Amino acid sequence: HFRRTDNAQSIHNPFVGNYIMDSFTTEVGGEVYFRKNGFLGMVGLTNGKLNQSVENPGKTSPSFVAKVGYDNNLSEDLRFRLTGSVYHTNQTSSAYLYAGDRAGARYYSVMEPVEGGSFRSGRMNPNLRNEMTSFMINPFVKYKGLEFFGVLEQATGKRASETENRTWNQYAAELIYRFGYDENLYVGGRYNYVDGEEVGGNNVDVSRFQLGAGWFMTKNILTKIEYVNQEYNGFNPQTILDQGKFNGVMVEAAISF
């Protein structure tokens, strides 16, 4: 899906923050698309990561991506969309999915030590660094101004130093109501939950609730306000995430072209 915020390109994200496991990567590749009578399909192949090296070409193999789905207006007021996608890399020196980001997290410096400077604040990186397969299912239903969007996601993989695969799951559901002239105003809520196994076998989970509202001042200018509450469970007592939580209000304005 393309619902995440990327720098000032936040028009498609009704909330300030992205998902806890943020599915973002930059890779060079090609894709082939098919569309007919509401059905859609895509297959693609990439170079596996952006910053390649000629010194050890055997470290990274191509990544495979694919998507299938159905998207159609069932009536004048009802739109239905259901898609499933997969990303697979058999071998890479450093997987960017869930780990890389050009913009950084919107919850700046939360759950970080004083001297910390991570761009992943408030996010979870499953650390499936060298081998990964990720599946995602996205249902979307819109009836008049009311819309539902969901995420069912599972990522499995490991670091090169590990012998067994680890699995991470992500679930999210959001409900948005758009109103006003040309639906230029909206209110909504999102629940996001992630659980999985860290390197070393520790089972953890993170939950987040977001409540927000937005105003499209023009089609290119969006202002948002959001309340967020996030909690961490099961983390090592020696880490800052042990029994961690944060909450607060974020205000954001963006101009996107």
What are these regions (language model features)?
Residues 78-88, 94-257:
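Outer-membrane beta-barrel pore domains
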Residues 1-69, 98-125, 247, 254:
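Surface-exposed coil loops of outer-membrane beta-barrel proteins
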